[in-house]
Amino acid sequence: MDTRAKGSPVLVYNPAAYSRRSLVEATVDLPAEAEGVAVYAPDGKTVPAQIVARDGARATVLFAAAMEPVSYAVYDVRAGKAGKGKVLRASGNTLENRVYKVTLDANGDIASVIDKRNGRDLVEKGKAFRLAVLTPNVSNRYPAWEIHKATLDQTPEPVDTDVRISVAECGAARASLKVERRYGDS
């Protein structure tokens, strides 16, 4: 196996019997002054990549990898400008890529999912995908996974106290929002 690389070689293995496209996270040595990361696929083309954590000259990087079934490949991680990914945006209460635009309401619930291909909102107007708690759960034997119908028939309690929404990350490989809420004493 040839692991020669101009930067840090990262071996990626796909044990599955089907092709996969996935994000890979690896910790590598990068110069402390490096502001970005460039990751090269085996064909020499850059792939979407970003630095997600730093500790001096150690960096945790995230990059997009495409793998054939039951195979491995060596990716080359170097300091530099990241390969451009598909358009990813995270700002305020919105996440967006080339296919979907997701908007959160003030409670941090999903208020809208626009399918850009069809120009259609997948969430009914005035509704939202909400985080809620079903209480009390009357199951004594398997309360972690057994939810009785009587519990499901009750109105769930909303989780909408002290809501804070912030951008967790917005890079070439991944974008995300962080929603923090309080429920009871948690």
What positions do the PLM features span?
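Catalytic and substrate-binding regions of extracellular carbohydrate-active enzymes
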Residues: 1-186
